[in-house]
């Protein structure tokens, strides 16, 4: 197997990177009909597997779970989750041959083995589904020509997929059909029905490609979604304690600060997030964000380049072959960091304090979101895809840190995201520690900014620059489809 993206010529690469179309709600008028009466078999029962299955069953589909024989015999977590929710469970040999749609929702590193095992068992003309295209694009898995290959990728952790569905809503979703595997032209109908069954059509669906989903997903999770949050958490906690802050208070300010700040981002983009600051603090955050973007632009570009070339995937798959030697080392190092070991703080921090004393946190969010978006768009990824893989998902990842700090974030995200997160943070932490953190001024972090006069012309120009950034333009339109979004922040 070889990297599928690298087998394409430049025109094909650009066409697939740039495939992105926001689908009208009328295109989902048939709902789940294309899958009604069909047998859907999900392989894997983790967060995405279980919660997508629950939604699909509640939408009237026939759903079962195929697990490895040893997982059933040993009654592992996946088996218990499926059976406790009343699903039919069987091994591959029992369930795969009767499936009309086999959905592979196992971790990325298991995809090659899983797909190699289920393919020979699939009946002629069946469909194979993914929620992340890594196996097709980066591994280059070859699928039988009679099999239709589709993707439905909710832009949310599995738990949120379920919770939004139960509210009568859904989460924004990308769908795609692999151009090499659509023998009967039925792929789009299957993908649309699957997206409807999970509730995605209620929140907005982008017709994308496997290539665009993978490359943008990898870039977002490595940089702003996980890498920047890890980098900022480690550096900001270190700075606060060095300046004499109570370690417990500092830990809470960082742990819940990301979530509180990005809740404003979720509701009104960078504009609303910056509007939560006082005028002097807004000007200072704008300046800090500009400095951060200048410093980090080469690092963001390197991650994008390595993702496009396949160098990132090649390195990660080598680590898979070495039993995750690097991943496990970096995970252990993160667990021993000062931020992770900070004592609990029993007092309350009111919501506005997270903004007033977290100007640097706001600046880091602004810089990271804009840089990730700009880098993806400059590489041929359409603005809508770049928005979903940067700004949209950030509050959801920040929420995991609020629950159990970086440990929870790295447990919830995929191993692929975790590996990329460490690569980014391992480079960004020393870069910013030496070239940026030492230049901070009083009021940037931990203390309110001293009162000072504001130049009206400067404030006007900053406000215009914030509002006119391309991510704000596309974000305002896409958020219009998500007016029922619930508030997720739990800070206190």
Curated annotation (Swiss-Prot):
Gene3D superfamilies: N-(1-d-carboxylethyl)-l-norvaline Dehydrogenase, domain 2, NAD(P)-binding Rossmann-like Domain. Pfam families: KARI_C, KARI_N. GO terms for biological process: isoleucine biosynthetic process; L-valine biosynthetic process. Residues 15-208 form the KARI N-terminal Rossmann domain. Its EC number is 1.1.1.86. SUPFAM superfamilies: 6-phosphogluconate dehydrogenase C-terminal domain-like, NAD(P)-binding Rossmann-fold domains. Mg(2+) 1 binds at residues 217, 221. Binds 2 magnesium ions per subunit. GO terms for molecular function: ketol-acid reductoisomerase activity; magnesium ion binding. The keyword Transferase does not apply. Pathway: Amino-acid biosynthesis; L-isoleucine biosynthesis; L-isoleucine from 2-oxobutanoate: step 2/4; Amino-acid biosynthesis; L-valine biosynthesis; L-valine from pyruvate: step 2/4. Its cofactor is Mg(2+). Residues 209-344, 345-485 form the KARI C-terminal knotted domain. It catalyses: (2R)-2,3-dihydroxy-3-methylbutanoate + NADP(+) = (2S)-2-acetolactate + NADPH + H(+); (2R,3R)-2,3-dihydroxy-3-methylpentanoate + NADP(+) = (S)-2-ethyl-2-hydroxy-3-oxobutanoate + NADPH + H(+). Mg(2+) 2 binds at residues 217, 389, 393. Belongs to the ketol-acid reductoisomerase family. Involved in the biosynthesis of branched-chain amino acids (BCAA). Catalyzes an alkyl-migration followed by a ketol-acid reduction of (S)-2-acetolactate (S2AL) to yield (R)-2,3-dihydroxy-isovalerate. In the isomerase reaction, S2AL is rearranged via a Mg-dependent methyl migration to produce 3-hydroxy-3-methyl-2-ketobutyrate (HMKB). In the reductase reaction, this 2-ketoacid undergoes a metal-dependent reduction by NADPH to yield (R)-2,3-dihydroxy-isovalerate. This is Ketol-acid reductoisomerase (NADP(+)). It comes from Edwardsiella ictaluri (strain 93-146). The gene is ilvC.
């Amino acid at each position: 197997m070889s990297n599928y993206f690298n087998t394409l010529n430049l025109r094909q690469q650009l066409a697939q990177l740039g495939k992105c179309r926001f689908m009208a709600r009328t295109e989902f008028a048939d709902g789940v009909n294309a899958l009604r009466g069909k047998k859907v078999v999900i392989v894997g029962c983790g967060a995405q597997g279980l919660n997508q299955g629950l939604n699909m069953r509640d939408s009237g589909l026939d759903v079962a779970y195929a697990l490895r024989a040893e997982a059933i015999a040993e009654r592992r977590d996946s088996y218990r989750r499926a059976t406790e929710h009343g699903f039919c469970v069987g091994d591959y040999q029992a369930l795969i041959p009767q499936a009309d749609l086999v959905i592979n929702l196992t971790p990325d590193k298991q995809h090659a083995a899983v797909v190699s095992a289920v393919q020979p068992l699939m009946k002629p003309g069946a469909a194979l589904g993914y929620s992340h295209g890594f196996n097709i694009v980066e591994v280059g898995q070859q699928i039988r020509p009679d099999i239709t290959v589709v993707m439905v990728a909710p832009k949310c952790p599995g738990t949120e997929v379920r919770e939004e569905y139960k509210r009568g809503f859904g989460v924004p979703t990308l769908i795609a059909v692999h151009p090499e595997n659509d023998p009967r032209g039925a792929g789009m109908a299957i993908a649309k029905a699957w997206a409807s069954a999970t509730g995605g059509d209620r929140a907005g669906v982008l017709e994308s490609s496997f290539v665009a989903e993978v490359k943008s997903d990898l870039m977002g999770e490595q940089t702003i979604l996980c890498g920047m949050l890890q980098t900022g958490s480690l550096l900001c906690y270190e700075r606060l304690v060095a300046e004499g802050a109570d370690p417990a208070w500092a830990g809470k300010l960082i742990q819940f600060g990301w979530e509180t700040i990005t809740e404003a981002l979720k509701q009104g983009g960078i504009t609303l997030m910056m509007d939560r600051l006082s005028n002097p603090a807004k000007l200072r955050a704008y300046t800090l964000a500009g400095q951060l973007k200048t410093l980090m632009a080469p690092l963001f570009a390197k991650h994008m380049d390595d993702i496009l070339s396949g160098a990132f995937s090649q390195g990660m798959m080598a680590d898979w072959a070495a039993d995750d030697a690097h991943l496990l080392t970096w995970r252990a190092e993160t667990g021993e960091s000062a931020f992770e070991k900070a004592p609990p703080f029993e007092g309350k921090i009111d919501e506005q304090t997270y903004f007033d004393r977290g100007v640097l946190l706001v600046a880091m969010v602004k810089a990271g979101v804009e840089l990730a978006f700009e880098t993806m768009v400059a590489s041929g990824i359409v603005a809508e895809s770049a928005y979903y893989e940067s700004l949209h998902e950030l509050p959801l990842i920040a929420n995991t840190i609020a629950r159990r700090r970086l440990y929870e974030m790295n447990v919830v995200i995929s191993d692929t995201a975790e590996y990329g997160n460490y690569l980014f943070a391992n480079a960004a932490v020393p870069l910013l520690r030496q070239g940026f953190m030492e230049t901070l001024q009083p009021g940037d972090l931990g203390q309110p900014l001293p009162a000072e006069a504001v130049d009206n012309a400067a404030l006007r120009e900053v406000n215009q620059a914030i509002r006119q950034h391309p991510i704000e333009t596309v974000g305002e339109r896409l958020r219009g489809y998500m007016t029922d979004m619930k508030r997720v922040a739990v800070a206190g």
